[in-house]
Amino acid sequence: MNEYKIQVINPCQEFLDDLKEYNLPVHNQLCDTIKEVISIPFKSKFKRLENSDRDMRARSGNFRIVYFVKNDTIFITKIGQHKNVYKMDVGCPKLSKKKLRSL
């Protein structure tokens, strides 16, 4: 079994850091899904995005984690609510503290 490294782009890391501070349950849920992606990135429940040969998505409640695998590294490029994540070019939404608490 391959061992994968993880690379989280900076806006996604900032989003996770903010969630940790203002909404720990959602943060923990996303981190659990990221750990699952690291262990088996091509698991059947993780879907390939339409119109993409490389990008995959993992579902975590109302959130989606978009990533791709290159060699032995998993690159997380987007994290967001399912209604918005596919519209984003790359990264994560900038949300107020109040909005983060209400997720």
Could you describe each region identified by the protein language model?
Residues 24-28, 43, 79:
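Non-catalytic, surface-exposed connector residues within folded enzymatic/regulatory domains
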Residues 2-5, 17, 60-63, 68-103:
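Enriched for short, Lys/Arg-rich terminal
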Residues 32-59, 93:
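A short, surface-exposed loop/turn module that caps and links secondary-structure elements
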Residues 10-14, 57-62:
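A broadly tuned preference for mixed-charge, low-complexity surface segments
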Residues 1-33, 103:
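Arg/Lys-rich, positively charged N-terminal/basic patches that mediate binding to nucleic acids
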